Amino acid sequence: MRRVGFLVALMVSALFVACGGGGGDGDDASESAPSRVFLSLGTAPPGGTFFVFGSALAETMNEFGGGFGWNTTAEATSGSQENIRRLDSGELDFALSNAAITYFAVRGTEGWEKAYQMRTVMTLAPNVALWISPADSGVETMADLRGQRVGVGVAGAGFEYFIRPLLGAHGITYDDITPLNATQSGAVDLLADGSAAAVFVGGAIPNPAITQASASQEINFIPFDETAKQQLIDEYLFFR
C-alpha cells in the first residue's frame, strides 16, 4: 500500500511538471519511455463484485496509467482477509477490502494478531448485506435461519467479521446454524441443489451472484429486523 501512495504522489508531481514547464524543449521528454512498473491488485474469488470491480480497475489503470509505465494485474484471492495479510507481506501492491474486515484489522481486534497499517485510497461502492433463500424453502425471516444449513462465505476470507454481528443482532450465533463455506457463486449452487436453506451474498449492487440465483429459481430476500438494524448502526461504524 505504501508503494501505491508513492506512485499516486509521483503521478501528481509529473502532471504539475508537465503543466508548468513552459520554455523547455519537450522533445526529450516525449522520446524517453517511462520505466515499467508492475502492480498486483488483490480482489476476491470469481462470482462476487470484488473480482468484477478489480478486473475493471486494473484495465482502467493500464489504459490511463500507461504513460507512467503502469502494468496492473488483478489477482483472484480468497478476499479481504487474505488481501490485508498479503499487503502487509508485500505480495500485493494494493487490494480491495470490505470496510468491516478492515475496521477490525487496523485495530488488531476480533482475532487479528496485530494492528495492520493500511491507507485507504478510495471508496468504491456501498457493500450491501443480503441473505437469500429459495422461495419455497420456508426461510422468510432471520429467525428462520435457526437449525438450517446456511452459506456463510469462503473460509478464511473474513466473512464472519460482519456475518457474526448481523446474526448476533437477531439473537443468533454460529452454533444455531450449520455454516457452509463456499464462494458466492458456489453458494448459489448450494441453494439450487438444496444443500443450503439460505446463503449470505454481500457485495455491491448489482451482485453477479444474485443475478445467477434469480435466473434459475425464485428467491426470497430475507429482511432485517428494524431494531436489529439500529443496534448494528449504533455499535459498528462500518454499518453507518
Model-predicted regions and their roles:
Residues 113-124:
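A structural signal for short loop-to-beta-strand junctions that line the ligand-binding cleft
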Residues 36-64, 127-195:
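Bilobed "Venus flytrap"/periplasmic-binding protein-like clamshell domains
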Residues 20-24:
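Bacterial signal peptide processing site
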Residues 26-40:
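N-terminal low-complexity, Pro/Thr/Ser-rich intrinsically disordered segments
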Residues 1-8:
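Bacterial N-terminal signal peptides that target proteins for export
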Residues 15-18:
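C-terminal motif of bacterial Sec signal peptides marking the signal peptidase cleavage site
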Residues 59, 73-114, 131, 139, ...:
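Pocket-flanking alpha-helical
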Residues 99-101, 108-110, 137, 173-240:
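Pocket-lining segment of extracytoplasmic ligand-binding domains
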